[in-house]
Regions:
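Outer-membrane beta-barrel initiation region
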Residues: 16-48
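Outer-membrane beta-barrel translocator domains and adjoining extracellular loop/strand segments
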Residues: 32-37, 66-70, 94-101, 139-145, ...
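Glycine/small-residue-rich loop that forms an oxyanion/phosphate-binding "nest" at active or ligand-binding sites
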Residues: 71-72, 81-111
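Outer-membrane beta-barrel transmembrane domain signature
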Residues: 122-214, 218-223, 231-237
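Cleavable N-terminal export/targeting peptides
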Residues: 1-19, 237
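Residues that define the transmembrane beta-barrel architecture of outer-membrane proteins
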Residues: 37-41, 48, 65-69, 76, ...
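Transmembrane beta-strands of outer-membrane beta-barrel proteins
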Residues: 19-25, 44-46, 53-59, 74, ...
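Glycine- and aromatic-enriched membrane insertion/assembly motifs of diderm outer-membrane
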Residues: 38-84, 159-166, 176
Length: 237
């Protein structure tokens, strides 16, 4: 009750800083991986205070094959964003521990902690550079002795912008900081360029209502596959 009262009090005090969004997609793409396919919904809610924020992110499929619930905290200013995500994918067919939400034991947990950083050069040079590392959790070596610290770095550039149409390109590379004797990392079967993406976004206007639409083509040379995503944002505030 005390924790609930604190959360409720924070919401009442900083209600104007609460933000949320919900998207529908034909799949869930992430760092060269197709996490889920089918009718996918993803949404989040977060509380902002000055340059800091804390929130929850969830995703799932209509048939229940994919289920995910994450917590995150972050800091942002004009150019830099830093985040720490606590990620738990508890899909029914998972090959890891998907039944103990609060188990953080490194050798047993089904979750992982993901450190994320993004830096945008400037408004004139809309180039984003990003470094992301799995710092704990189910990113283990074959013997389950140590973490691999799998890392994904990428550069993203705003290629074209006219009115409300945007086209972005992204090049991503994955590797592990600690995987002696092994090739694979959390994101691909070996180190290499595992994401080449082209992303197009434009809102669809229906009366006074705008529905942001997205088209995302993603190629993964390392794992020899290509994927396409369509998305629509149902609401945001």
């Amino acid at each position: 009750m005390i924790i609930f009262s604190m959360i409720t009090g924070s919401i009442l005090l900083y209600g104007q800083e609460i933000h949320s969004a919900l998207q529908l997609r034909n799949n869930h793409l992430w760092r060269g991986i197709e996490v889920a396919s089918g009718l996918v919904y993803t949404g989040d809610i977060h509380l902002d205070y000055k340059n800091f924020y804390v929130g929850f992110w969830a995703g799932g499929t209509a048939n229940g094959d994919y289920k995910e619930f994450n917590n995150y905290i972050g800091y942002k200013n004009k150019h830099l964003t830093l985040e720490l995500w606590d990620i738990y994918n508890f899909s029914p067919n998972a090959t890891y521990n998907n039944k103990e939400f609060f188990n953080y034991n490194a050798k047993e947990t089904g979750r992982f902690m993901d450190f994320r950083s993004y830096y945008t050069i400037s408004d004139r040079i809309p180039l984003m550079l990003s470094w992301n590392t799995v710092i704990s959790g189910r990113d283990r070596n074959k013997e389950n002795i140590h973490n691999k610290y799998s890392t994904f770095v990428f550069a993203e550039y705003l290629v074209y912008k006219k009115d409300d149409l945007e086209v972005r390109g992204r090049l991503g590379y994955s590797f592990a900081l600690n995987n002696p004797g092994e090739q694979s990392n959390f994101f691909s079967k070996k180190a290499g360029f595992n994401e080449i993406s082209l992303m197009i976004s434009k809102p669809l206007t229906i009366g006074s209502y705008k529905i942001p639409l997205g088209l995302w083509g993603m190629w993964n040379p390392v794992d020899n596959r290509a994927l396409l995503q369509f998305s629509a944002q149902v609401y945001s505030f």
